[in-house]
Amino acid sequence: MRAFDLVREWPASNTSLCAIDRHGVAHTFGDTTRTSRIASVSKLITAWATLIAVEDKSTSLDAKVGQQDCTLAHLLSHAGGYSFDGTVPIVTPGRKRIYSNTGYELIANHVEQVSEISFADFLREAIFEPLGMAKSFLNGSAAHDIVSCVDDLAELALELRNPQLISAITASVATTTQFTELEGVVPGVGRFDPCNWGFGPEVHGAKHPHWMGSRNSASTFGHFGGAGSFLWHDPTSNISCVGLCEVEFDAWAMHHWPIFFDSVIDELSR
């Protein structure tokens, strides 16, 4: 892919990438078997596993988790009222989109309680083994400490495109905006009103400037991580992209990633 030529301008070493075209064909760059911590892209996996628990009736989106009147649905969509890392809620649920690692740790604790196994084991049984993500595992917080590789994350992207582990209806709900019209901040990116988010994935919407590209449709959903990781799927073009870098997300990514993503979409849409 010619789009991969743009990566030479990135200040990131050992970059590995996978772009999946509308036919499901994967185009790769770099060592896609190399493992690293995927940072907040972990939240996509944690959320998908939680939705599996919801579908098998172990819990429900209306289950009370955390502060008073807070539900699993609130926490999955960063509407639970918890700050980035604080354990004390700062607003009531459903009032603001406050991106929260704490919320995802509460989710993992809840799934552990209802499943009666560790969350690491739950991820392995519910996600990693069924999808063949052989190099992936949880090594700490469910919010940001999953270790994986691009090959494994490409399998996750295929699941997000064509869900097999959860129903198409649940997947559609999860990848569209929940608790609409909430304003909030995407850390490292900016404040948006509304700040669109699903049950796990961020939804592109009309956010600008943004880490996604201008060619990404409003319905594009995914996540990036502070370790220089990203995964998104664009339902309009039916194109997905996954990447792991060894340079933390910063201004360089806000500049280079959208250019690269636009090039990927342009090239694979032909």
Where would I find each of the regions flagged by the language model?
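A generic beta-sheet turn/junction motif
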Residues: I52-V54, P235-T236
